[in-house]
């Protein structure tokens, strides 16, 4: 099942490399504030994310901040639904996905695998997550443990996507913000970090 889900991601962004972060037990961050905050200023690795529907819990302000505009369309699906998992790939989903779209073409997504993921499997998923047209975020903060982050050209010359993914307990959570050509990469990275912080802190709970 994990192979199928990993393949769906690879179809979307190609084949390449990602940064894998496996923080030691001594690492710690500061307490998140109520406002969306860059990941570098918070510690979300100890969150426990449920493997179930969560779109209703996400805050509208955070979604619109990630899109840099209002939501014009949504694309949600649950595990067991037949859904478009990637461009040209429609199949039975084994994940819970929340997708939001703006009129500008910007997209914000968050999804969690329905099946539990072991630490060994998570390390493998983190290493294989990016693709051709991607580059690693060498200074990316941790998002779960282990975690990975990448910037990819989803459609060469037309869109860029920033994706963070990681293991929270036994849940493999991913989040992504993408925008059409013309959006600054640094701004897109900041928006993705804030979006991921919001998803993890809203959906996840402390043990």
Task: Give the role of each language-model region.
Residues 1-30:
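Hydrophobic single-pass membrane-targeting/anchoring helices
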Residues 22-207:
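A small/polar (G/S/T-enriched), proline-flanked helix-loop surface module common
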């Amino acid at each position: 099942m994990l192979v199928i889900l990993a393949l769906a991601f690879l179809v979307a962004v190609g084949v390449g490399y990602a940064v894998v972060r496996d923080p030691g037990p001594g690492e710690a961050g500061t307490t998140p504030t109520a406002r969306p905050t860059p990941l570098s200023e918070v510690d979300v690795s100890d969150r426990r994310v449920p493997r179930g529907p969560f779109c209703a819990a996400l805050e509208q302000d955070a979604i619109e901040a990630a899109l840099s505009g209002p939501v014009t369309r949504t694309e949600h699906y649950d595990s067991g639904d037949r859904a478009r998992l990637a461009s040209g790939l429609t199949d039975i989903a084994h994940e819970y996905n929340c997708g939001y779209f703006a009129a500008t073409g910007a997209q914000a997504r968050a999804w969690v695998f329905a099946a539990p993921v072991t630490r060994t499997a998570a390390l493998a998923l983190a290493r294989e997550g990016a693709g051709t047209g991607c580059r690693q975020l060498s200074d990316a903060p941790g998002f779960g443990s282990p975690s990975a982050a990448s910037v990819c050209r989803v459609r060469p010359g037309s869109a860029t996507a920033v994706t963070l993914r990681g293991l929270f307990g036994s849940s493999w959570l991913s989040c992504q913000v993408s925008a059409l050509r013309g959006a600054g990469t640094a701004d897109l990275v900041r928006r993705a970090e804030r979006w991921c912080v919001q998803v993890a802190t809203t959906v996840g709970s402390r043990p």
